[in-house]
Amino acid sequence: MNEKRFPASEAHRLDNPARIEWLAPSEVLNTLNLHAGQTVADVGAGTGYLSLPFAQFVGPKGKIYAVDAQAGVLSLLQQKIDRSHVSNVILIHAEAHETGLPASCCGLFFMANVWHEIEHQSAVLKEAMRVLEPGGRVAILDWRPDVEPVHGPPVADRIDVSRAMESLRFAGFEQAVSTEVGRYSWLVQGEKLQ
């Protein structure tokens, strides 16, 4: 068990309505430039804070693979799916480095606020490369270490955006870019060219 992993017993915090003030799903969607019909792997999906908005955005021809290593949070996400009548979210109980997804099945491999928890980041990026179709993108959103820790993990656990960018380049992703999203987060993206 990863000691940095967000505890499933605290999953209610993932659905705190105040969260929208500092990380609005609409801002994340705009930054990612998703399109209708796209297939997205939301890795570390948790209770679906972003999975459900992604599902609505990509529409019925799109697909969201909501991947999480904790069955408890996926159970909570399933309840939300049932209540919202969303039909294009598929739950996957798996680790980020072994999602079990088919090769070249996704246009976006997305992770929000889990990068600092991942012990074997290079293995996760290798999995992203396997799962992404040519031209697909990996996107990592995580906590900035240069802001007061009102929310999120301790500053000592946070990762600087430059390290994430370096990891993307080392893993073979091209055209890596970064931006700030919300009050407390950075987002990096890179493209699989082949």
Regions found by a protein language model. Give the residues of each.
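Class I SAM-dependent methyltransferase SAM/SAH-binding core
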Residues: 41-43, 47-98
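Helix-to-beta-strand junctions that scaffold the AdoMet/dcAdoMet cofactor pocket
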Residues: 58-59, 118-119, 132-134
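Core SAM-dependent methyltransferase catalytic element
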Residues: 171-174, 180-194
